[in-house]
C-alpha cells in the first residue's frame, strides 16, 4: 500500500515538473516572438507608418547620389538607381520618385550620352517602377505633363537595349487611360513608334540580332495592349471622338496580324503569345483589327502545330489552342463573313 502511495506522489511530482517545463518553454517562445516583433518594427517611422526608417534612409541616400551623379563613381550611381527601382514599387516611394527635382534628373540621366547605357537604362526602369499600378503617381505624372518627355526621350534613342527599357517605361505609363490619351491625342506618340519600328526592322541592320527585333515588336505590342486595357473602363465610342484611337489601333493591329501570319513557324513562343494576346485585346475593345484573312488563318485547326516548338510540346499546344479559341470567340467585324 505504501508502495502504491509512493508511486502516486512521484507521478504528481513528475506531472508538476512537466507543467513547469512546458510553461517555461511557452513563455520563452512568446518572449522570442515578442523580441522578433520589436526588432522588425523598431524601424517604423512615426510620421509615416507605410515606410520604415531604414527604407526612408536608403531612398534619401540614393536620391542624393542620383541628384549629384558626377560626384560619385558610376557603379555607385547605378547601385543607387537599382535601390530606388526596388523601393519605387512601394506606393509612397513611387509618388516620391515623381517629385522634383528627382523626376527631371532621371530624364537627364536617361538622355545623357556621356553616361553608361546601364545608368541610362536603369533611370527608365526607376520611373517605370514608380508608375506601375500606382494611381497617385500616374495622376502626378499627368499633372507634370510627363508624356512629351517620354516621347522625346524615345525619339533621341539609338541604343537597342536602352530603347527597350524606355519602351518598358512607356508601357507602364499607358496603363492609365489619361496617360494613354496624352500619348495618342496628338498622334505624336504613335507616329514616333512607327518610325522606331520602321528604322529598327529594316534588313540593313545586319548587326542587330533578330532576337532584338522580336523583343522590340513584343514591347510595342505590350504598349498597345495596355492602351487597349486602359480603355476597358472607359466608353470607347466617346474616347474615339476625342482621340484618333481607331486609326492607331487599326494601324498597329495590322502590323501585328501580318507579322503573326508571316512568321508563325519561325518566331519564339513568347513573341507569338504576346502578339496574339494583343490582337485579341484590341479586337475585344474596339473591333479595329483590319486584316480580312486573319480570321480564316486563325481558324485553321492545325495552326498551333505549325510551329515546331509548339508541335514538340503537348502542354504548349494545349495552351496555344486555348488562346486561339479565345481569339476566335471575339466579335470580329462583319467583313470577316462569320
From Swiss-Prot:
Its main location: membrane. GO terms for molecular function: adenyl-nucleotide exchange factor activity. It comes from the Eukaryota. GO terms for cellular component: endoplasmic reticulum; membrane. The chain crosses the membrane at residues 20-40. GO terms for biological process: SRP-dependent cotranslational protein targeting to membrane, translocation. It is found in: Membrane. Keywords: Membrane, Transmembrane, Transmembrane helix. It is a single-pass membrane protein. This is Uncharacterized protein C1071.03c. It comes from Schizosaccharomyces pombe (strain 972 / ATCC 24843) (Fission yeast). The lineage of its organism: Eukaryota, Fungi, Dikarya, Ascomycota, Taphrinomycotina.
